[in-house]
């Protein structure tokens, strides 16, 4: 999948799940299941409920995504 095909949206972490998975509520009200990208994992950036994040969604499955950025 090319990088151009992803949909980037902003949301808020609602719940922390096992294996670095999170429930994220998007700005449009939808809830998606998202995992942490490799760069965030590599730099030990902690993500807690209530944090504002950027999520990449695949056009093929809009219920799952990848967290690519945590706002300060």
Curated annotation (Swiss-Prot):
InterPro entries to which the protein is assigned, alphabetical: NA-bd_OB-fold, RNA-binding_domain_S1_IF1, S1_domain, TIF_IF1
Transmembrane segments: none
Protein localization: Cytoplasm
Disulfide bonds listed in the record: none
Annotated keywords: Cytoplasm, Initiation factor, Phosphoprotein, Protein biosynthesis, RNA-binding, rRNA-binding
Pfam families hit by this protein: eIF-1a
GO terms assigned for molecular function: ribosome binding; rRNA binding; translation initiation factor activity
Modified positions (Phosphotyrosine) in chain numbering: 60
Family annotation (PROSITE patterns): S1_IF1_TYPE (PS50832)
GO cellular component terms, A-Z: cytosol
Keyword Thylakoid: no
Domain S1-like: 2-72
Record-stated family: Belongs to the IF-1 family.
Function: One of the essential components for the initiation of protein synthesis. Stabilizes the binding of IF-2 and IF-3 on the 30S subunit to which N-formylmethionyl-tRNA(fMet) subsequently binds. Helps modulate mRNA selection, yielding the 30S pre-initiation complex (PIC). Upon addition of the 50S ribosomal subunit IF-1, IF-2 and IF-3 are released leaving the mature 70S translation initiation complex.
SUBUNIT field: Component of the 30S ribosomal translation pre-initiation complex which assembles on the 30S ribosome in the order IF-2 and IF-3, IF-1 and N-formylmethionyl-tRNA(fMet); mRNA recruitment can occur at any time during PIC assembly.
Protein name: Translation initiation factor IF-1
Organism of origin: Bacillus subtilis (strain 168)
Lineage, highest ranks first: Bacteria, Bacillati, Bacillota, Bacilli, Bacillales
């Amino acid at each position: 999948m090319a990088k151009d095909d992803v949909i980037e949206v902003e949301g808020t972490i609602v719940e922390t799940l096992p294996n670095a998975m999170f429930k994220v509520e998007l700005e449009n009200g939808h809830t998606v299941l998202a995992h942490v990208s490799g760069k965030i994992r590599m730099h030990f950036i902690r993500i807690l409920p209530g944090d504002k994040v950027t999520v990449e969604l695949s056009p093929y499955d809009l219920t799952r995504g990848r967290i690519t950025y945590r706002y300060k």
